[in-house]
Amino acid sequence: MRAPPKHLLEPLNPRQRMSLLLIDEVPDRVVVYPLVTAHAATIAGISVRRTVTEGKSMAIAQLAAQRYYKHDALSVFSDVGLIAEALGSKLYYREDDVPVLQQPVLEHVEQGQDLSLPEAASLPGRYEVYIEAIEMLLREAGDILPVMVFIPAPFTTAALLRGTEDFLVDTLLDPESCHRILELSFKAGLDLADLCIEAGGIPMLVDPLASASVISPKTFDDFAVPYLKRFSDYLHRYDFDVFLHICGRSEPILHGIRRTGCDLFSCDDVSLELCRSRIGEEIRIIGNLKPTDLLEETPEKIERKVEAILAAAKESPKGFVLATGCEVPIGASRENLLAFVREGRRRGMYWGKEE
């Protein structure tokens, strides 16, 4: 009889490891969670288009990728336009890449007052893809792996209802109408989160268009933070720890991250030492290998970068998750991602010696 794979001989399984982190206990090692989303399609030999339009295909791809890389969580995610599409925006579907905005539903910002919330129970748009994927992943691996579900946050959804550039101009010229669109986006986000929680998923808010690479700190404070805070308050009623992911530059908005109410912050382009010093006493940090490194570097360089990341943040006071700063690129080197996970597990030990 063959011995079980080494990753199954660890003291804790991934779900136990994440659970200890979330109750402020020290797990056996750092949670290793590269954001493997559309890249999973390449491992399963399925088109990206199928994984974002078929729940079963998404789940099959996630399971195949996790078996291959041995990372610590599964990810249910298609694209940030999911809610905007359900509210009427049109997306353009590509065979081997994620959908992109083709036509926002709002030609003028004032039209936001005419938009209505779809009936969540009818699973508008592609919501059924999410629910089917969550249910299948829970059946197949939910006892040992957390099933993370990426929920587009209100600011990002609002921008995709209007068109990002137009919406940013609108925040200056007609903030009142922008807040009406944000309120609708917030309520639609809650509806999707409810469905995903009821199916068994763990929500993670994703707000890429609220990045300091896109908007100013003032716009973040005025138009993103209030809705993230209300979303966090809502999820806390479920007794969930709130995960928030904002890619791109984060340093200019770190002051506002605390006010979002999140419990875990997934960061991208920011010094982990700075992140740790500013928010690490209150918020668990998730990060932050540059996704492009998985395309451009060698496995040996990835190992050195993981070592540096862990040196900077492994002992963050509230806790740390080793992750990529954003989604793993579709064409990422498999050898590089294997090196990332392997080195994270080896150097991320808290109990006893390194593997």
Q: Which stretches of residues belong to each language-model region?
A:
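Active-site loop segments of alpha/beta catalytic cores
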Residues: 1-40, 46-49, 61, 72, ...
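Residue-identity detector for glutamine
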Residues: 16, 62, 66, 102-103, ...
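A short secondary-structure junction motif
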Residues: 45-46, 89
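Short, structured active-site "lid" loops
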Residues: 50-60, 67-69
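Intrinsic-disorder/low-complexity, polar/charged segments
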Residues: 54-56, 107-111, 124, 176, ...
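Glycine-rich, N-terminal phosphate-binding loop and its surrounding beta-alpha-beta segment
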Residues: 62-90
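A contiguous, low-structure linker/loop signature
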Residues: 79-120, 143-144
